[in-house]
């Protein structure tokens, strides 16, 4: 079994396409801004891994030298590493929450509105021509908590969540 599994996530020779500051329209007329990182696969369609958060999608994070993950110009705090994921056939979509980073509006962290915005961003992404229609979410801490909230709304295109180090019980974990 292990011999078969070792080749599952091996990188391919995809080139990386980077789209910065892409506008995502929301149901209430507001917009969010996202950075999209995707494999250059011609007509091939890819699933997307998304996150939303207030930590500025453009803010570069450099990991310590002793981590397996190596620095690259596309890393951001507690989000998916697009260099790693895109090489394996996934797109990464990093969204600034309303009122944070480049997204205009009033910031309301951990709110129902943020979950609705994430729902809209997921469904918008699923309809893009390069997307297979399948969306997963990934992130650590705050980005993990956002996944629980949007999953509760059951966006049709959301197929998986990967919440790392987030709260499982908001009341118990925060009070």
Give residue spans per PLM region.
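N-terminal cap/lid subdomain of alpha/beta-hydrolase-fold enzymes
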Residues: 35-90, 95-98, 109, 152
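Alpha/beta-hydrolase fold nucleophile elbow
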Residues: 129-142
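Short coil/loop residues immediately preceding or within conserved phosphate-binding loops
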Residues: 19-21, 132, 145
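Loop/turn elements at helix/coil->beta-strand transitions in domains of secreted/extracellular proteins
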Residues: 31, 45-48, 88-91, 131-134, ...
């Amino acid at each position: 079994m292990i011999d078969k599994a070792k080749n599952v996530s091996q990188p391919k020779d995809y080139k990386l396409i980077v789209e910065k500051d892409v506008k995502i329209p929301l149901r209430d007329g507001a917009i969010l801004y996202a950075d999209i990182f995707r494999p250059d696969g011609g007509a091939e369609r890819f699933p997307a891994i998304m996150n939303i958060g207030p930590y500025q999608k453009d803010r570069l994070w450099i990991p310590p030298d002793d981590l397996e993950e190596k620095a690259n110009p596309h890393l951001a705090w507690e989000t998916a590493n697009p260099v790693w994921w895109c090489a394996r056939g996934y797109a990464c979509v990093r969204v600034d929450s309303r009122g944070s980073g480049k997204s205009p509006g009033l910031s309301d962290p951990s709110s129902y509105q943020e979950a609705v915005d994430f729902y809209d961003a997921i469904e918008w992404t699923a309809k893009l021509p390069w997307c297979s229609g399948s969306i997963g979410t990934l992130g650590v801490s705050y980005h993990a908590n956002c996944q629980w909230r949007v999953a509760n709304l059951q966006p049709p295109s959301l197929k998986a969540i990967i919440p790392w180090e987030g709260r499982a019980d908001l009341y118990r974990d925060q009070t």
